Swiss-Prot record:
Disulfide bonds join 45-110. It comes from Homo sapiens (Human). The keyword Disulfide bond applies. The keyword Signal applies. This is Immunoglobulin kappa variable 1-12.
Length: 117
């Protein structure tokens, strides 16, 4: 059975703090992915300036609160399946789903935690 479904897997979270000396923009790519169950999916996130490893990844499904998947760039939150992994530091980060499952079709966000207004 062909499980290929156009799905919005990714979201864009732009963090911009006007008037701050440490404005940080987060840009995800690609903006959307069409994927099948079993596929390896990679999402990238780039910070406009270095944030060390202060990055988290979230999953959100319609009508639900965001769920923390990865914190400190590569640490798996308790209870999150090991098919999710994170890597990177500085400005470039990656979220990988090693084998996409039906329940993984969702929107994914990165969030920096290096600076706040």
């Amino acid at each position: 059975m062909d499980m290929r479904v156009p799905a919005q897997l990714l979201g864009l979270l732009l963090l911009w703090f006007p008037g701050s000396r440490c404005d940080i923009q987060m840009t995800q790519s690609p903006s959307s992915v069409s994927a099948s169950v079993g596929d390896r999916v990679t999402i990238t996130c780039r910070a406009s300036q270095g944030i060390s490893s202060w990055l988290a990844w979230y999953q959100q499904k319609p009508g639900k609160a965001p769920k923390l998947l990865i914190y400190a760039a590569s640490s798996l939150q308790s209870g999150v399946p090991s098919r999710f992994s994170g890597s990177g530091s500085g400005t470039d980060f990656t979220l990988t789903i090693s084998s996409l499952q039906p329940e993984d079709f969702a929107t994914y966000y990165c969030q920096q935690a290096n600076s706040f207004p």
